[in-house]
């Protein structure tokens, strides 16, 4: 998939910034993604495709990563707008996280349906919001990432835990129950989500500490 190749090229450029072939491929793939967004978007639909599908937040995350490497502020703005639109689609009226349900797949330009909800969506959302928070420091990204992680712990439509007591993760949330299977994808999604939210919390705590640190009147340096 181009989305995977985008991320690979970003890694290559991050280690060898002068790698011209990698940069050219990144420009091409990211440009295609941006063109899709600008072609498909319409009133009340700020997305790359006519449908919401699987692992949705990876699309704006990839575009946001590419914008950082390429120094494209226009690309960055479009990526943040798409992620913000997805954030609103994934927020229930009661305020908790509600990932795009699998019943939504194939429904063009329609609001997402609530079920079935899958662990992969919460992980992808946390990763994308963590990157967005690093980009602009907007508290909404931090809050939405926390809401997505809380989904695993019971802050969801049924009020039940998706994460199992032994550190595993069930396969999803159906309209009337939890799918008690524990596939590798679901377990890994929860484990990676836990790592991602820990990193986000550490970064946010460091920023909060810096903001609260008093500044000396002379010289403008932080007091110690």
Residue ranges and their predicted role:
Residues 1-224:
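Glycan-recognition and catalytic cores of secretory/periplasmic carbohydrate-active enzymes
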